[in-house]
């Protein structure tokens, strides 16, 4: 297994519920290290740019509105098979379909307000990390 980096967002719904620490603990207990982290309020332009691949989809406006509705925590996670491990921890996109004990099953309300985002590939992880973090902001541990 290779050590990878992946990108994570703790979304506005989870930040509002004050479960940042609980979610972060899940990452760490699964062997993922947080090598960069910051809380920020996304601007409309930042959210539109980040989710540009969905710009033609019907839900795009609602997605941008949700992601700018409150602060988020953006993080870089590092560890063995980090991308797959993070996706397993998150659970299915729709929390009603997420396995018990996953982040979305435990902390998300709906497919729209689903607590977390995680990269789905190495290419996506590299792009998403670079979108929010300068190389000098990502540490090694």
UniProtKB/Swiss-Prot annotation:
Known cofactor(s): Mg(2+)
Catalytic activity field: a 2'-deoxyribonucleoside 5'-diphosphate + ATP = a 2'-deoxyribonucleoside 5'-triphosphate + ADP; a ribonucleoside 5'-diphosphate + ATP = a ribonucleoside 5'-triphosphate + ADP
Function summary: Major role in the synthesis of nucleoside triphosphates other than ATP. The ATP gamma phosphate is transferred to the NDP beta phosphate via a ping-pong mechanism, using a phosphorylated active-site intermediate.
HAMAP family for the chain: NDP_kinase (MF_00451)
Subunit structure: Homotetramer.
Record flagged with keyword Transport: no
Transferase listed as a keyword: yes
Broad class of where this protein is predominantly found: cytoplasm
UniProt similarity note: Belongs to the NDK family.
Positions annotated as active site in the UniProt record: 117
Signal peptide coordinates: none
Name assigned to this protein: Nucleoside diphosphate kinase
Pfam families linked: NDK
Biological process annotations from GO: CTP biosynthetic process; GTP biosynthetic process; UTP biosynthetic process
């Amino acid at each position: 297994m290779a050590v990878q980096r992946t990108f994570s967002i703790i979304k506005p719904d989870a930040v509002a519920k004050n479960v940042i620490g609980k979610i972060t603990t899940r990452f760490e207990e699964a062997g993922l290290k947080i090598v960069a982290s910051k809380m920020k309020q996304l601007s409309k332009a930042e959210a539109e740019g980040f989710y540009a691949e969905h710009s033609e989809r019907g839900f795009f406006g609602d997605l941008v509105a949700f992601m700018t509705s409150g602060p988020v925590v953006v993080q870089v996670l590092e560890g063995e098979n980090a991308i797959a491990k993070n996706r397993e921890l998150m659970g299915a996109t729709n929390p009603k379909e997420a396995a018990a004990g996953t982040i979305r099953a435990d902390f998300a309300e709906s497919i729209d307000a689903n607590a977390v985002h995680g990269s789905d590939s190495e290419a996506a992880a590299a792009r998403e990390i670079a979108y929010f973090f300068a190389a000098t902001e990502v540490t090694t541990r």
